[in-house]
């Protein structure tokens, strides 16, 4: 419950932040800051030590393990800050924009702050207790939103985006120690233990970060800040519904898989159950978001942002389909198959970056989006192959387990598009809102109706429908007991 509430509130705050900042800033502002945040993501990915996963997987971490994790994170944060300070001027010169210098210095400082976070919070995650995570996530997002909106409304400057990031990290550190008092000590014990687990996982993180971030640097250099601003905004909005609806589930999945990793049959059953539930929830949300993208953009962002509609439509649908194999990451980590995850990410990097580079040079932003669709589907297939290797569940079995969700989402999208074609042209915000609400309601009814009809026709097999009915029954029972008491 706490994780669901946390993600719902964080999701709402993220959307609110995006909308409000889009009112005060221009696409070029988002593109400029996206260059800095992308370089930051690549550097942090290249130095990622996966200490959280190592502490979760450890049988019985002691104080010395937490102190070692804090020491490593602090050293890493300081190194990244120094690297960004040294690279700030050359990067600004390369992209021909001196404003990047200050942006990179501020972003580097934010990473140094993040390295100071309390590693003891992992204790709650290991025990699947998420109340504290709720307060941490909501507080940091709220402070970041407040800081960025104040700067944007006052100065209409790209610094609003940067200040929000720094404020978020500062709040993250302060609240982490308020929730779980802890006095860190510098120690160099257990470094070998951490590196033995995280070596391949860190390499995988490097490849994965380059894989999914390098295109932003290419677009910024080849196409400029304004197209990059559209691309960055579209990409961020497209991934938002899928990511936020599945985050509460995904946060509990890795610890759960790690706890049963020595029982192959239980692990395979748990994976199939979790994957079907994730897809049943995320697929209709992502596909539905793609269908309503045009009216949503006009309503909340304004017509200046209309070029992001195609980006959202294409990428939101791809992100939704990718959830079919998205749990391969926690599955592979739980089984210690981090080397295989690294190989996967390197294969995708070698395929993806050259194609996107050529597409950007020859066909512009639309060419990049088409390549994203193709490589997204390819990565989904590779993930399904890896799942088969890890736990023996065939690709056909994985797809069959998601048949109802796939068919229901396809019919939902078709139905909403067909019915929407009869809507009159909206002439104002109120009409646009009414049509958007109608699309959402129609989509929800179609998806649920088709899904549960198929489930009934298939003799009610065990699946996400069973899980959802059980959850609704528990909620109904609790409400009934409260009313009667």
Residue spans for each PLM region:
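Signature of the first transmembrane helix
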Residues: 1-49, 76-90, 105, 110, ...
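Specific pore-lining/lateral-gate transmembrane helices of multi-pass inner-membrane transport
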Residues: 57-72, 230-346
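Helix-terminus/linker motif at the lipid-water interface of multi-pass membrane proteins
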Residues: 15-29, 92-94, 150, 211-240, ...
């Amino acid at each position: 419950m706490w994780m669901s509430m946390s993600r719902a509130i964080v999701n709402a705050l993220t959307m609110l932040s995006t909308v409000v900042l889009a009112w005060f800033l221009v696409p070029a502002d988002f593109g400029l800051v996206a260059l800095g945040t992308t370089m930051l993501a690549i550097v942090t990915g290249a130095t990622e030590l996966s200490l959280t996963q190592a502490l979760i997987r450890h049988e019985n971490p002691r104080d010395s393990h937490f102190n070692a994790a804090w020491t490593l994170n602090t050293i890493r944060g300081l190194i990244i800050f120094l690297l960004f300070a040294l690279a700030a001027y050359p990067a600004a010169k390369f992209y021909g924009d001196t404003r990047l210098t200050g942006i990179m210095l501020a972003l580097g400082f934010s990473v140094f702050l993040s390295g100071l976070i309390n590693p003891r919070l992992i204790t709650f995650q290991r025990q699947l207790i998420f109340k504290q995570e709720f307060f941490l996530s909501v507080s940091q997002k709220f402070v970041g939103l407040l800081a960025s909106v104040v700067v944007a409304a006052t100065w209409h400057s790209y610094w609003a985006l940067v200040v929000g990031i720094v404020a978020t990290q500062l709040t993250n550190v302060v609240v982490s120690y308020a929730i779980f008092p802890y006095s860190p000590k510098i120690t160099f014990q257990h470094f070998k233990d951490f590196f033995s687990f995280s070596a391949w996982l860190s390499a995988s993180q490097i490849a994965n970060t380059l894989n999914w971030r390098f295109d932003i640097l290419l677009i910024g250099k080849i196409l400029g800040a304004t197209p990059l601003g559209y691309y960055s905004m579209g990409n961020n909005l497209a991934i938002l519904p899928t990511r936020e609806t599945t985050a509460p589930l995904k946060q509990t999945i890795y610890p759960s898989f790690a706890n049963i990793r020595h029982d192959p049959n239980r692990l395979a059953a748990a994976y199939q159950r979790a994957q079907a539930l994730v897809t049943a929830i995320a697929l209709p949300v992502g596909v539905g978001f793609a269908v309503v993208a045009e009216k949503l953009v006009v309503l909340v962002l304004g017509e200046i942002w209309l070029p992001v509609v195609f980006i959202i439509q294409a990428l939101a649908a791809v992100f939704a389909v990718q959830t079919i194999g998205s749990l391969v990451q926690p599955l592979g980590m739980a089984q210690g198959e981090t080397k295989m995850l690294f190989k996967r990410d390197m294969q995708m990097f070698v395929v993806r970056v050259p194609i996107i580079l050529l597409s950007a040079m020859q066909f512009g932003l639309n060419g990049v989006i088409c390549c994203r669709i193709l490589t997204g589907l390819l990565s989904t297939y590779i993930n399904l192959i890896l799942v088969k290797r890890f736990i023996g569940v065939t690709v056909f079995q994985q797809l069959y387990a998601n048949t109802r969700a796939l068919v229901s989402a396809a019919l939902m999208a078709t139905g909403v598009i067909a019915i929407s074609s009869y809507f009159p042209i909206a002439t104002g915000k109120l009409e646009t809102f009414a049509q958007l609400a109608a699309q959402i309601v129609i989509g929800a009814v179609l998806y649920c109706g088709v899904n549960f009809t198929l489930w009934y026709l298939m003799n009610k097999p065990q699946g996400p429908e069973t899980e959802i009915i059980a959850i609704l029954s528990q909620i109904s029972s609790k409400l009934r007991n409260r009313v009667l008491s």
